[in-house]
């Protein structure tokens, strides 16, 4: 996401390169965080996460299916966890669209079948609970 030149100096950008995958975290003056995870492979899978430091939700603003790129998915989850912890984000116990992923539950969907994204809630006891909700793109 491009910003006006006069705001560029106020932005902090962290870019990490893992093998052929790049993780970029932009911190904008408006306290909006953007995480971009992209691959240098021909597939060019890319996902962008955006949320405000004042918000308890982490809405996905743009995403493309991960396919079989499980390492990219793990990096994406790690980035969400790192940024959430650094920002002190605490997600509510129930999110819209939350669904069970227990195989014994009749009609339950398995993770990864509908491009569901996993975020984590950070209660006081430090236990991380997976929460699934559909991606929007």
Curated annotation (Swiss-Prot):
Record carries keyword Membrane: yes
Region named Disordered: 93-116
Its membrane topology: Single-pass membrane protein
One GO location term (cellular component): membrane
Sorted UniProt keywords: Membrane, Transmembrane, Transmembrane helix
Stretches that traverse the bilayer: 75-91
Location (main, coarse): membrane
Subcellular location(s) of the protein: Membrane
Protein name: Uncharacterized protein YDR215C
Provenance organism: Saccharomyces cerevisiae (strain ATCC 204508 / S288c)
Lineage of the organism: Eukaryota, Fungi, Dikarya, Ascomycota, Saccharomycotina
């Amino acid at each position: 996401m491009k910003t006006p030149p006069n705001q560029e100096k106020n932005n902090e950008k962290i870019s990490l390169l893992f093998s052929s995958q790049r993780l970029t975290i932009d911190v904008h003056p408006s306290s909006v965080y953007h995480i971009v995870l992209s691959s240098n492979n021909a597939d060019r899978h890319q996902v962008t996460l955006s949320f405000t430091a004042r918000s308890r939700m982490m809405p996905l603003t743009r995403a493309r299916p991960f396919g079989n790129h499980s390492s990219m998915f793990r990096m994406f989850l790690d980035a969400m966890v790192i940024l959430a912890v650094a920002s002190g984000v605490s997600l509510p116990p129930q999110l819209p669209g939350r669904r069970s992923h227990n195989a014994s539950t009749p009609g339950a969907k398995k993770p990864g079948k509908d491009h569901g994204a996993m975020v984590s809630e950070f209660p006081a006891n430090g236990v991380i609970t997976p929460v699934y909700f559909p991606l929007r793109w």
